[in-house]
Regions:
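Conserved glycine-rich "GG(E/T)P / GGGxP" loop and the immediately following alpha-helix
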Residues: 70-97, 127-130, 134-147, 154-160
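Cofactor-binding loop segments of dinucleotide-utilizing enzymes, especially the Rossmann-like FAD-
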Residues: 28, 80, 107
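Short, surface-exposed acidic-centric catalytic microdomains
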Residues: 27-75
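Structural recognition of alpha->loop->beta junctions
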Residues: 68, 114-133
């Protein structure tokens, strides 16, 4: 089980395509220790304020209901960190059963993703948030700019799609 921020939200900017809206879950628990963390309370995997505990199966069921309302099969897993040691087994199990196209946001690098044999995602955004070079996220018809230019984007075959925080869509 893991704790998820409530309510589960939707956003068009978080998912790495230029097509549609995505559901976004915020998982509790993070081991990255980023300076000036945006949500330091989310580092605690047992943080209870406005969160609910889910099994992977319960989360999939809840997301299926929301996907009908928002008409999407896209999901962003954020946090905290979905690939923090306290969340890895939950995330792996969830990715095995989900029908969603998943984009994972992690502060870890791609070697961490490979080391733990994370599979079943469509995209993974790697790299600690760098508050010194923060810039507002932006999504246009041509590109998506991440909040931190040191973050990298990979596809499900571990191919590097962006190394500078900007992903250009293939139109």
């Amino acid at each position: 089980m893991t704790r998820i921020l409530q309510p589960i939200s939707s956003s068009w900017i978080d998912y790495t395509d230029n097509e549609s809206i995505a559901l976004t879950i915020v998982m509790m628990g993070c081991d990255n220790g980023c300076p000036k963390c945006q949500n330091p309370e989310f580092q605690n995997p047992f943080y209870e304020n406005m969160t609910k505990e889910f099994t992977p199966e319960e989360l999939e069921k809840e997301l299926q209901k929301l996907s009908k309302r928002y008409r999407t099969n896209k999901l962003v897993m954020s946090g905290g960190d979905p690939l923090a040691p306290c969340n890895i087994e939950f995330t792996k199990k969830f990715l095995e059963i989900t029908t969603f196209d998943v984009c994972i946001y992690t502060g870890h690098d791609i070697e961490w993703v490979k080391k733990y044999n994370i599979k079943g995602f469509k995209f993974v955004k790697c790299g600690k948030f760098d508050y010194k070079s923060f810039r507002e996220s932006l999504k246009t018809d041509e590109m998506m700019r991440f909040a931190s230019p040191n973050q990298e984007l990979y596809d499900d075959n571990f191919n590097l799609l962006s190394k500078d925080g900007i992903y250009y869509f293939n139109n």
